[in-house]
Amino acid sequence: MSDYVVIGKITKTHGLFGSVKVLPLTNALEVFQKLENVFIKNDAQSNTHRLQIEEIRKAGKGFLIKFSGIDDEERARKIVGLSLAVRVTDLPKPKSPNEYYYYELLNVEVLDQSGNFIGRVEDIIQTGSNEVAVVKNGSFEMLIPVIHDYIIKFEKRKRLVVKVPEWI
């Protein structure tokens, strides 16, 4: 699925006419507003299936989406738990060179300010205030806030240079 980026997760059905609630897995919410089609994917499998969006609207921290061909709660229930993805080429371009998508951080090597290898970004988790990179090196794990105070330099898909918090 390297040509695709997961942008959300279908969490539950909504109503009787096939709408579903989607939890965004990106902070670039404008991606959702421009969608006409998405690909659904079971995380355990590599195949994708394209769905056309009939209607999309913001609802709390997520979105309510109505797909063409999914017209009742029973059909909607079959896609609950699946991931929503878009083609990488369909993502809006970042507004500045200092902006990036979280998928671009995954698996990159992380170095401290002195050039010492810390580990690789295994995951990005969302907290209440900001996102945090989960950096692992064997059994060693470090959580680094993904904010300008800690990110010194990012070379897309290669390496991330970070300021290691003083308390570590």
From Swiss-Prot:
GO terms for biological process: ribosomal small subunit biogenesis; rRNA processing. It is found in: Cytoplasm. InterPro entries: PRC_barrel-like_sf, PRC_RimM, RimM, RimM_N, RimM_N_sf, Transl_B-barrel_sf. GO terms for cellular component: cytoplasm; ribosome. Pfam families: PRC_RimM, RimM. GO terms for molecular function: ribosome binding. Keywords: Chaperone, Cytoplasm, Ribosome biogenesis, rRNA processing. Its main location: cytoplasm. The keyword Glycoprotein does not apply. Residues 97-168 form the PRC barrel domain. Binds ribosomal protein uS19. An accessory protein needed during the final step in the assembly of 30S ribosomal subunit, possibly for assembly of the head region. Essential for efficient processing of 16S rRNA. May be needed both before and after RbfA during the maturation of 16S rRNA. It has affinity for free ribosomal 30S subunits but not for 70S ribosomes. Belongs to the RimM family. The PRC barrel domain binds ribosomal protein uS19. This is Ribosome maturation factor RimM.
